[in-house]
């Protein structure tokens, strides 16, 4: 049963104290959100909020008096520990309304004035302590419009940086788009029914937030413009609806306008190489198949020196580009960094430009997020100090980029680093060299910045001389040699006299505190001075807070250039990290062409090669005359690694990175598909085979001649003949209809006949060799089909009992003998005469049985335990069995 009163007006509030009435009004405003209600040094929660918070945060649940005759549940957290509790709540998908005291307790006649100043939700985090340093945390909104031809509008905002994006797609693509963006929170209309998987928090808002006119008006008002034409979104009505609703929600959570959100970036179909959720997972771009952060492609490449660079690298890996021009610009910048390093020894000594640049980047904080917090007025003093120091280092970094002028992109980035000198000068004058953590602690504004503050500080802190003089005068006046003038936070200033000297105390001394061995007094002169000092401390802190607010006002005009500078620093950092990785590991610049083609010479898997001592390079050629590679070979032979390797090299090439190969040529791709591995979707009621077919259906429906498709052992989840038939039909469809660039791994050797019918298909295999010790995987891709699968040898290496291996070998021989005249390829070719087939099967079955019996007898003999006579007898028996 709910312990919270259901109404907050009229008679419902009459039975509550004024403070609780205030709380209930604010709680009604917060709605279902947890309300952190500031009371002194604690945030308190009451009623259901207290019970919920106590359960989620493991807090002690207490009571605070009675209201309407019922004890009020209460739980609280210290103000200084708020961030750690917020982080835990947000991780659990909770949202919290922060209510602060905004009135002066000393001047308040009733409850101190309070107001909800901020709402913290999973998608609206801006505090450094709550955000992952190397990943974005976006807030998204979705709106589906139209009945005859529905369109899904999607908007997403990174509140910690101000980046605001929109796009439109078919409703069926919405889940894939959300997986690409990976927002922490999704806003949708109350009546909207979105049947799709989404792991983040969902928030419903009134339908009218998504109405076209209101959403458009919200955007026009925010950007202070009469038209959205300048943002290139006029032809995206569903996206505009989503963007307006999102901006309204985000502004409400911050209780202010979002000054750092200064533009909308419209993303169009065809801008990126599309990767569906299955492909992102299978390629392990930023998360392993087991959910770990390492080893992944991102963890391998992330040598960035700033959090901004790491986040940009993550975005690049998830958003490979289709068009060659921007990719080539990045690639050229990386090549220039490497070339200057090799040839620019005179300018940069032995270290080289690349090392100099990367070392310089170490000095830069997360300017992207600091700029956002300046706009939101939540920036901390020490962040401003780090920004000040970064601006001091910026001119030297800018000058060091001069040798990169051969790269147009590097020149553009260098130009973006230029900052107005005023901001650096302002921060240098205003912020103390080592400011306090929070403005409430004082010591943030630098000495000399404000004369009034300097006077108050002097009055509050430089009273040492006065106290020394007062103590000397009082000792002389009273004749008390051990008299002391001291201070503590509880009783303020006092004169302490030992018990044995109290008879010498003058009449103007007033007792302040009695101790066991001493008395403490105050005099009119000391009281007057105490009032001045304590008043000066309060006024000093108030003045400093006011000056800090004025400083934030002055810094607001620099948010845009700060954001541009941060963007340039992030890209320079990312490019330098990719250049350093290419230099260390012998990666090369791929050739980018317009046609759909992949030609790799001696390619390597970027992650696997770093995990093993020796990696075998392999090439791959897919072009107009060679659309599909049918890949056969043993289990553990490296088929899946090879396929992923090709996809990762293609993806890296489309991000602008160098690639692990001796030579590579990669064309314009529109999508990358993968069908690798097997997994059940138990919650969705789909078996392994159903999942396999669902993924295959998506590939057949969407792949084009410009797509790269990876299909691994399709059809293995059902019976042999069903699986073979499906694998053949799917491969044939991909080859003749979709015409996608396809890597098709299979254990169905019957499929290796496909190139005989379709010349644009080719056979390759992962080589293996048998030795006395068993099978040896060569991990080398060779032309032509494999001769066998070596499944039993792999099982033997895995530790399957010898008896099972022997029985499996006999069964394999029997099956091969039976199936030799009528291989499964008979599904697609004419069968032999039935009588001839039957006779051959009978003869081979008899031979196989005799051979199996002989093998069993031989395996049962232990030569070491036989006498010479017994060994000779055994040999005769075996010989007789053969005849």
Curated annotation (Swiss-Prot):
<dbReference type="GO" id="GO:0005829">
    <property type="term" value="C:cytosol"/>
</dbReference>
<dbReference type="GO" id="GO:0005524">
    <property type="term" value="F:ATP binding"/>
</dbReference>
<dbReference type="Pfam" id="PF01624">
    <property type="entry name" value="MutS_I"/>
</dbReference>
<dbReference type="InterPro" id="IPR036678">
    <property type="entry name" value="MutS_con_dom_sf"/>
</dbReference>
<dbReference type="InterPro" id="IPR027417">
    <property type="entry name" value="P-loop_NTPase"/>
</dbReference>
<dbReference type="GO" id="GO:0006298">
    <property type="term" value="P:mismatch repair"/>
</dbReference>
<dbReference type="Pfam" id="PF05190">
    <property type="entry name" value="MutS_IV"/>
</dbReference>
<dbReference type="GO" id="GO:0030983">
    <property type="term" value="F:mismatched DNA binding"/>
</dbReference>
<keyword id="KW-0238">DNA-binding</keyword>
<dbReference type="Pfam" id="PF05192">
    <property type="entry name" value="MutS_III"/>
</dbReference>
<keyword id="KW-0227">DNA damage</keyword>
<dbReference type="Pfam" id="PF00488">
    <property type="entry name" value="MutS_V"/>
</dbReference>
<keyword id="KW-0067">ATP-binding</keyword>
<dbReference type="GO" id="GO:0003684">
    <property type="term" value="F:damaged DNA binding"/>
</dbReference>
<dbReference type="InterPro" id="IPR000432">
    <property type="entry name" value="DNA_mismatch_repair_MutS_C"/>
</dbReference>
<dbReference type="InterPro" id="IPR007696">
    <property type="entry name" value="DNA_mismatch_repair_MutS_core"/>
</dbReference>
<dbReference type="InterPro" id="IPR036187">
    <property type="entry name" value="DNA_mismatch_repair_MutS_sf"/>
</dbReference>
<dbReference type="InterPro" id="IPR007861">
    <property type="entry name" value="DNA_mismatch_repair_MutS_clamp"/>
</dbReference>
<feature type="binding site">
    <location>
        <begin position="633"/>
        <end position="640"/>
    </location>
    <ligand>
        <name>ATP</name>
    </ligand>
</feature>
<dbReference type="InterPro" id="IPR007695">
    <property type="entry name" value="DNA_mismatch_repair_MutS-lik_N"/>
</dbReference>
<comment type="function">
    <text>This protein is involved in the repair of mismatches in DNA. It is possible that it carries out the mismatch recognition step. This protein has a weak ATPase activity.</text>
</comment>
<dbReference type="InterPro" id="IPR017261">
    <property type="entry name" value="DNA_mismatch_repair_MutS/MSH"/>
</dbReference>
<protein>
    <recommendedName>
        <fullName>DNA mismatch repair protein MutS</fullName>
    </recommendedName>
</protein>
<dbReference type="GO" id="GO:0140664">
    <property type="term" value="F:ATP-dependent DNA damage sensor activity"/>
</dbReference>
<keyword id="KW-0234">DNA repair</keyword>
<dbReference type="InterPro" id="IPR007860">
    <property type="entry name" value="DNA_mmatch_repair_MutS_con_dom"/>
</dbReference>
<dbReference type="InterPro" id="IPR016151">
    <property type="entry name" value="DNA_mismatch_repair_MutS_N"/>
</dbReference>
<dbReference type="Pfam" id="PF05188">
    <property type="entry name" value="MutS_II"/>
</dbReference>
<dbReference type="InterPro" id="IPR005748">
    <property type="entry name" value="DNA_mismatch_repair_MutS"/>
</dbReference>
<comment type="similarity">
    <text>Belongs to the DNA mismatch repair MutS family.</text>
</comment>
<dbReference type="InterPro" id="IPR045076">
    <property type="entry name" value="MutS"/>
</dbReference>
<keyword id="KW-0547">Nucleotide-binding</keyword>
């Amino acid at each position: 049963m709910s312990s919270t009163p259901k109404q907050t007006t009229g008679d419902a509030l009459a039975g509550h104290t004024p403070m609780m009435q205030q709380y209930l009004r604010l709680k009604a405003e917060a709605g279902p959100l947890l309300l952190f209600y500031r009371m002194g040094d604690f945030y308190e929660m009451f009623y259901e909020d207290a019970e919920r918070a106590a359960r989620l945060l493991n807090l002690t649940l207490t009571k605070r008096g009675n209201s309407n005759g019922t004890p009020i549940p209460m739980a609280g957290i210290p103000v200084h520990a708020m961030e750690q509790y917020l982080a835990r709540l947000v991780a659990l998908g909770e949202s919290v309304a922060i209510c602060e005291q905004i009135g002066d307790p000393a001047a308040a006649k009733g409850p101190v004035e309070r107001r909800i100043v901020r709402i913290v939700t999973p998608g609206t985090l801006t505090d450094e302590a709550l955000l992952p340093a190397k990943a974005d945390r976006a807030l998204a909104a979705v709106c589906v419009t139209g009945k005859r031809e529905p369109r899904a509008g999607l908007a997403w905002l990174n509140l910690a940086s101000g980046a605001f994006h929109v796009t439109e797609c078919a409703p069926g693509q919405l889940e894939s788009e959300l997986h690409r963006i990976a927002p922490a929170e999704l806003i949708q209309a109350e009546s909207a029914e979105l049947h799709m998987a989404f792991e983040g928090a969902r928030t419903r808002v009134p339908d009218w937030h998504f109405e076209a006119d209101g959403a458009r008006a919200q955007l026009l008002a925010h950007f202070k413009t009469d038209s959205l034409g300048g943002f290139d979104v006029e032809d995206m009505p569903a996206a505009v609806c989503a963007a307006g609703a999102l901006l309204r929600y985000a502004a409400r959570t911050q209780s202010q306008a979002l000054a750092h959100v200064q533009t909308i970036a419209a993303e169009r179909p065809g801008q990126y190489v599309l990767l569906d959720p299955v492909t992102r997972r299978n390629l392990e771009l930023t998360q392993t198949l087991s959910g770990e952060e390492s080893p992944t492609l991102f963890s391998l490449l992330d040598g960035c020196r700033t959090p901004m660079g790491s986040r940009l690298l993550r975005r690049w890996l998830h958003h490979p580009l289709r068009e060659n021009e921007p990719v080539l610009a990045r690639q050229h910048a990386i090549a220039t960094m490497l070339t200057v390093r090799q040839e620019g020894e005179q300018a940069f000594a032995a270290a080289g430009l690349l090392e100099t640049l990367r070392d310089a980047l170490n000095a830069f904080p997360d300017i992207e997020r600091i700029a956002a917090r300046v706009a939101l007025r939540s920036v901390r003093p020490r962040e401003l100090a780090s920004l000040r120091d970064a601006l001091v280092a910026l001119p030297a970094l800018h000058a060091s980029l001069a040798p990169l002028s051969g790269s147009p992109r590097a020149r553009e980035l260098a130009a973006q680093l230029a900052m107005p000198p005023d901001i650096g000068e302002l921060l240098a004058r205003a912020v103390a060299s080592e400011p306090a953590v929070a403005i409430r602690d004082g010591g943030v504004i630098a000495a000399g910045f404000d004369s009034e503050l300097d006077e108050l500080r002097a009055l509050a802190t430089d009273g040492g001389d006065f106290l020394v003089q007062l103590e000397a005068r009082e000792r002389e006046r009273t004749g008390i040699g051990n008299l002391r003038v001291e201070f503590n936070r509880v009783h303020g200033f006092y004169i302490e006299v030992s018990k044995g000297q109290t008879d010498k105390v003058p009449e103007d001394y007033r007792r302040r505190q009695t101790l066991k061995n001493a008395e403490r007094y105050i005099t009119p002169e000391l009281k007057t001075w105490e009032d001045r000092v304590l008043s000066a401390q309060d006024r000093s802190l108030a003045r400093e807070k006011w000056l800090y607010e004025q400083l934030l006002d002055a810094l607001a005009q620099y948010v845009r250039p700060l954001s541009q500078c941060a963007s340039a620093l992030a890209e320079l950092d990312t490019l330098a990290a990719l250049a350093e990785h290419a230099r260390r590991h012998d990666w090369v610049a791929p050739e980018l062409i317009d046609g759909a083609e992949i030609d790799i010479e001696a390619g390597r898997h970027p992650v696997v090669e770093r995990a093993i001592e020796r990696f075998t390079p392999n090439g791959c050629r897919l072009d107009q005359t060679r659309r599909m590679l049918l890949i056969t070979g043993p289990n553990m032979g490296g088929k899946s690694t090879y396929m992923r390797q090709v996809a990762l090299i293609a993806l890296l090439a489309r991000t602008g990175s160098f690639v692990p190969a001796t030579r590579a040529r990669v064309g314009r791709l529109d999508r990358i598909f993968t069908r690798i591995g097997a997994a059940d979707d138990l919650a969705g009621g789909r078996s392994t085979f159903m999942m396999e077919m669902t993924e295959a259906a998506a590939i057949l429906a969407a792949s084009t001649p410009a797509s790269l498709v990876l299909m691994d052992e399709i059809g293995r989840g059902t019976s042999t003949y069903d699986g073979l038939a499906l694998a053949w039909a799917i491969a044939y469809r991909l080859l003749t209809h979709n015409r996608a660039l396809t890597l098709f791994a299979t254990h169905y050797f019957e499929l290796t006949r496909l190139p005989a019918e379709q010349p644009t298909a080719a056979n390759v295999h992962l080589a293996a060799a048998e030795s006395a010790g068993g099978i040896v995987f060569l991990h080398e891709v060779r032309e032509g089909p494999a001769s066998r699968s070596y499944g039993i040898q792999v099982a033997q290496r895995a530790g399957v009992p010898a008896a099972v291996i022997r029985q499996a070998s006999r069964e394999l021989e029997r099956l091969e003998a039976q199936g030799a005249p009528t291989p499964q390829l008979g599904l697609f070719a004419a069968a032999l005469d039935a009588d001839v087939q039957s006779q051959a099967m009978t003869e081979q079955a008899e031979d196989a049985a005799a051979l199996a019996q002989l093998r069993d007898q031989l395996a049962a003999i232990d030569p070491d335990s036989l006498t010479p006579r017994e060994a000779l007898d055994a040999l005769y028996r075996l010989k007789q069995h053969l005849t």
